[in-house]
């Protein structure tokens, strides 16, 4: 049985990750959720090409959105450079919880342009979370 994944994504890193997820025969992508304010057109095309639901929502922690997510019955959520913070109810909704991939050392570097701020602050080390 395939692992049913909900994919929350934005930007170039998420394109590469989605490509890899789609190639894995042990996984099934239930949907692609893009940022609401400026939905990623590349993700939208990839979702359509692969017959995946493409969704956006301004408040992913709302009761309305949680209702949608329950219907997908995902085993795992994967968040790749997504722009909204997941609250515990959403994180814990899938049986295997949620994996968040972020290009900075949380909670110290949140948001966008993380590498820029690490350089400006003359950090001696840098990581991803």
Positions of predicted regions on the chain:
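One-carbon transfer enzymes
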Residues: 1-129
